[in-house]
Each structure stands twice: as C-alpha cells, then as structure tokens.
Amino acid sequence: MSKHFFLHNEFHWQGRHDAEDGAAGSRVHHVVQQIDYTHIGENPYGVALLGFACDAGVARNKGRIGAKKSPDLIRRALANLAWHSPHPLYDLGTVVCDDDLLESSQQHCAKMIAEVLPSVPVITLGGGHEVAWASFSGLARYFEQHHPEKAPKIGIINFDAHFDLRAFSSSQADIKPSSGTPFNQIQHYCQQQGWDFHYACLGVSKASNTRALFERAEQLNVWFVEDKDLGSVNHDYHLTQLQHFIDDCDYLYLTIDLDVFPAATAPGVSAPAARGVSYDNLAPFLDRILAHRDKLMLADIAEYNPTYDVDSQTARLAARLCWDIANAMNDKLEHQ
C-alpha cells in the first residue's frame, strides 16, 4: 500500500498506569495492539480501530477544515478510559488523504475494512463525513467477496444534523463527491447492485437542510427524525420505529456525525449545531442499536474538528462514543 495514503501505526498509546491494581486496572492503552491489518486473522477476537485523516470532503463541501487532525486526538482521549472486556482492541493505523486525493484515500480505507471484516468488526475514526463512503464501500466489498450469492440487507443508521444526500455529479455545475454526498453515493451504488437502500437519519435539522434535500430523502424512503422531535417525550414512539427499522435489516452500519450534538456539547466540529440533540436524548437510541451487537459490523465517528474544540471536550465525547461501540462489539462474543 502506498505510503502516500497510509501511515502505519505511528501513534504512541500511553496513559495512566495503576500498578497496585494489576490486571484489574486495565485501561485502553494497556490492551490496544498495533498490528498490520493483513495479519488480523491470526489474532484473537477483538475490535479494530482505523483512522481516516481527511477533510478534503469538508473542503469540497465549503466547510471548516481541520478534521484531518482528529484520529490521533480521539485515540489520545480514548487511551485512558478503563477497559473491562477480556478482548483487545487492534489499532490498524491511519489512512491519510493528502491534498485533494479523496477518492484514492477512500478506496484504500475501503480495501482495509473489507480485508479485516471477516475476522473482526471495525470502528473508523474520521475525518470528515466523507468517511461514510469509504466505510460503506469496504462493507460492500466484504459482501461481494464473501457472500456474493445474496443481496445483503444493510441498515445504515446516521446520527446527523444533515442528510448528506447532496448530488455528487452534475452536468450543470462543477460538483464532486464531498462530505455532503456519501449517502447519495451509497444509494446510487445500491441501485446499481440491485440492493435495497435502508437509510435512517436521526437528529436532522430542518434549518440546515434545504427543501431539495428533504424531497430527496422522501423520494428515497429515508426514515428520519428531526432534532426537535428526539426529546424524551417522544422516545417510546421513535424507539419503536427504530426497532422496526433494525428488524427489517440483517446487518447494521452505524455512523455518528458529531454535529448532531449541540455546539455547547460538541464545539469542535466542522458545522456546529445551534440546537442539536443532547447526549441524554440520543443515548436510548444508541443503546437500542448497540443491543443488536449481532448485526452491528461497522461504525464510524465523523466530523471532529480539533481546531475549534474547547478543552478537548469534543474529543472526549468522540472517545466515549467509540468506547461504548467497541464494548458492545466485543460483547458479541460473550453472547454467542
């Protein structure tokens, strides 16, 4: 793999060490193993972490750049969190997108994801939300290589203030794939393959999406819930709808754009939310998804922008989300 796109495990994991507690004092930095992704099948079951250092898609979408620096800062915030699982984490390194080489970087990221999914689930640390096209492409490649006999029913669940259904090509304007286009790209791919497109977008902001994007979502039968409707008073109804969505799918891909949270909670994002959805209101939906660990194969966290963070609070939020997802994925083995 070209060194231009891939930095092999250069992050140095370190953190607090409580020697008096022995193995019971384990933290993430104690259990994470940096390995070559081609050797993942030789190791015990765990969860793989893969960085995607890229904000070329954000730049193309006319957003605030800075997300390229995020994977290692999420790792740093993750390193000191307590680790209770008997299963390890595997750090596969970071795919780096230099200049505007977005498509090539996405292909490299997808290749790595496809190669490790037969052995372990994957959490990708973005980067802008262009990571979603890389993540899904890797998942799709996995199914094409290992289960070509049947079209997979993949449920895509996106916590996001934006649909990210913008056009990725046009004869009337100079348009390229960006952080605003991944789910339109995914739908186009599914259509070409004859796969159903199951897309849920939770926390979408009516103020941040044009009428054209809402019409596109309706056209594609996207199940969405606006930010203002994710309050606790509506939890039971929307959780039931989420359960129906999950039941209709055989596999789940979870993607979290940190701009779904209020700017006061997540200031370090490419597009801060004036309203957003509180962590407390979002948590029951995340918990419901993680309860279906048998279906959850892939997740990513996107749009952390450390340039605008305050006291690393957005990094800590991203790390906690990663920690929650990784624990659920590792629990899969305990419940088999």
Curated annotation (Swiss-Prot):
UniProt pathway annotation: Amino-acid degradation; L-histidine degradation into L-glutamate; L-glutamate from N-formimidoyl-L-glutamate (hydrolase route): step 1/1
Cofactor binding: number and manner: Binds 2 manganese ions per subunit.
Reactions accelerated catalytically: N-formimidoyl-L-glutamate + H2O = formamide + L-glutamate
Needed co-factor(s): Mn(2+)
EC supergroup of this enzyme: hydrolase
Keyword Signal attached: no
InterPro entries: HutG (IPR005923), Ureohydrolase (IPR006035), Ureohydrolase_dom_sf (IPR023696), Ureohydrolase_Mn_BS (IPR020855)
Annotated EC: 3.5.3.8
Molecular function per GO: agmatinase activity; formimidoylglutamase activity; manganese ion binding
GO BP annotation list: L-histidine catabolic process to glutamate and formamide; L-histidine catabolic process to glutamate and formate; putrescine biosynthetic process from arginine, via agmatine
UniProt: Mn(2+) 1 binding residues: H129, D160, D164, D257
UniProt keyword terms in alphabetical order: Histidine metabolism, Hydrolase, Manganese, Metal-binding
Residues annotated for Mn(2+) 2 binding in this entry: D160, H162, D257, D259
Gene3D superfamilies assigned to the protein according to its UniProt record, in alphabetical order: Ureohydrolase domain (3.40.800.10)
CDD domains: Formimidoylglutamase (cd09988)
Highest rank taxon of the organism: Bacteria
Family the UniProt entry places it in: Belongs to the arginase family.
Biological role stated in the UniProt entry: Catalyzes the conversion of N-formimidoyl-L-glutamate to L-glutamate and formamide.
Name of the protein: Formimidoylglutamase
Gene from which the chain derives: hutG
